[in-house]
């Protein structure tokens, strides 16, 4: 089936640099964060801000405005304002991400799934992200959604603090998120409230900590080869 004749469903081109807003959450020093090595390249003194793309002003372009309008209208019918449930809309590199306040995540997901003009029938899982510099919002959960009916893709992003790492589970809306939420809990420590069986899925039950967090200590064991031995990662130069 051809998509010709459906220009309104095409994703927009890259937003101009003038229209982008960024949020600085930290500063990175040195090349790739290397520490404790003899640097002769000069890059060891590199100082670079850590930036997150901020909210994008209207118009978003392509079908992104249609999705935002449809979501806003459906939320209003539920008695919730768009700005109350959605804290940001970011268009970056031809993709759109709706930042959702965590208490409204199940409602937003259900509306996106059930509203005929939206019909995002498929959630492709959940990805955890850890931003230690993003104070009060260190843990992020990202949900890629696909509308098979309308041939559209969007993302939902929810943030939670380290001190209260709870996000509502989407198991009731998208049951296939079952194992994805368990994996994100396993590796990042995000607690998905309402999940029917939130247990570790890859690491042993008694494993300390959550290994994909950026503050997780690097460790390992030496690996022996014929005539040589490779030191464990925590005994090598540090990169972060």
From Swiss-Prot:
Cell membrane as UniProt keyword: yes
Entry similarity comment: Belongs to the complex I 30 kDa subunit family.
Reactions catalysed, as given in the entry: a quinone + NADH + 5 H(+)(in) = a quinol + NAD(+) + 4 H(+)(out)
Functional summary from the UniProt entry: NDH-1 shuttles electrons from NADH, via FMN and iron-sulfur (Fe-S) centers, to quinones in the respiratory chain. The immediate electron acceptor for the enzyme in this species is believed to be a menaquinone. Couples the redox reaction to proton translocation (for every two electrons transferred, four hydrogen ions are translocated across the cytoplasmic membrane), and thus conserves the redox energy in a proton gradient.
Enzyme class: translocase
Gene3D superfamilies (alphabetical): NADH:ubiquinone oxidoreductase, 30kDa subunit (3.30.460.80)
Bilayer topology annotation: Peripheral membrane protein
Molecular-function GO terms, alphabetical: NADH dehydrogenase (ubiquinone) activity; NADH:ubiquinone reductase (non-electrogenic) activity; quinone binding
NCBIfam families, per the entry: NuoC_fam, PRK07785.1
Localization per Swiss-Prot or TrEMBL: Cell membrane
Enzyme Commission number(s) of this protein: 7.1.1.-
Annotated keywords: Cell membrane, Membrane, NAD, Quinone, Translocase, Transport
GO cellular component: plasma membrane
Residue span of region Disordered: 1-21
Protein name as catalogued: NADH-quinone oxidoreductase subunit C
Gene: nuoC
Residue ranges of coiled coil: none
Highest taxon listed in the record's lineage: Bacteria
Quaternary structure note: NDH-1 is composed of 14 different subunits. Subunits NuoB, C, D, E, F, and G constitute the peripheral sector of the complex.
